[in-house]
Design a protein with these regions (language model features):
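Intrinsically disordered, low-complexity regulatory regions enriched in Ser/Pro/Gly/Thr
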Residues: 26, 108, 147-148
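Short amphipathic alpha-helix that is part of the acyltransferase structural core
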Residues: 1-25
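Conserved beta-hairpin
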Residues: 15, 28-45
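C-terminal "cap" of GNAT-fold acetyltransferases
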Residues: 124-159
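Acyl-donor binding region in acyl/amide transferases
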Residues: 4-5, 29, 36, 48-138
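Short secondary-structure junctions
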Residues: 20-24, 113-117, 142-146
Length: 159
C-alpha cells in the first residue's frame, strides 16, 4: 500500500460514491489517499478541525471522513498516516468518531484508544440547522441509513 496526495474534489468524489452513511465535506485541513499494489485508489481519509467546539483547541485534529472500497488493512493504513501527518504538523492529538455498532478494529490496530467519555448521537436535524434527511441510500454494503441516528464512540490518539 502507498499513500498518495489528493485534492478536495477527488476525495469528495470518492466519499460521495462509496461512503456508507455520510456526504462529502465542505473543507478539511488535509486528505490522504491509499493506493493498492496495482495503483488503484482504494481509500481516502480527510482530516479537519474538530466538529466539537470544546475539542477545537488548536492542538487537536479530527478524521472527519474515512472511506475505503473494502481493501484489507486500508483503514488501519489511513488512520496511521493521518496520525503521522498530524504529528508532523505539530498537533498533539487526533480524534475520530465511529458508530456504536462498529467495533473499531482498524483504530485499535493503529494504536488509537477509545475515549471513556460518553459521546452523543442521534439526529443532527433541527429547526436552526435543517439537514436533508435521506432515509436510505444504496451502497456496496447494501441499503443503509444515510444519516444513522445511533450513538457514537470517540477514539483518540495522543501524538
Amino acid at each position: 500500500m502507498k499513500a498518495v496526495p489528493l485534492d478536495l474534489k477527488e476525495a469528495n468524489d470518492y466519499v460521495s460514491r462509496l461512503h456508507r452513511h455520510h456526504a462529502p465535506v465542505y473543507r478539511d485541513k488535509f486528505r490522504i489517499g491509499c493506493q493498492d499494489d496495482e495503483g488503484n485508489l482504494c481509500g481516502v481519509a480527510q482530516v479537519g478541525r474538530p466538529v466539537n467546539r470544546i475539542m477545537d483547541d488548536g492542538k487537536t485534529l479530527e478524521v472527519v471522513r474515512l472511506c475505503t472500497d473494502g481493501t484489507p488493512n486500508a483503514c488501519s493504513f489511513l488512520y496511521s498516516r493521518c496520525a503521522r501527518v498530524a504529528k508532523e504538523l505539530g498537533y498533539s492529538r487526533i480524534v475520530t468518531y465511529i458508530l456504536e455498532s462498529e467495533d473499531g478494529a482498524s483504530l485499535k490496530a493503529s494504536g488509537w484508544k477509545q475515549d471513556k467519555t460518553s459521546v452523543g448521537g442521534g439526529s443532527w436535524n433541527c429547526p436552526s440547522r435543517p439537514r436533508d434527511v435521506i432515509d436510505r441510500q444504496i451502497s456496496m454494503f447494501g441499503e443503509t441509513k444515510k444519516y444513522p441516528t445511533e450513538k457514537k464512540k470517540r477514539f483518540c490518539k495522543e501524538l
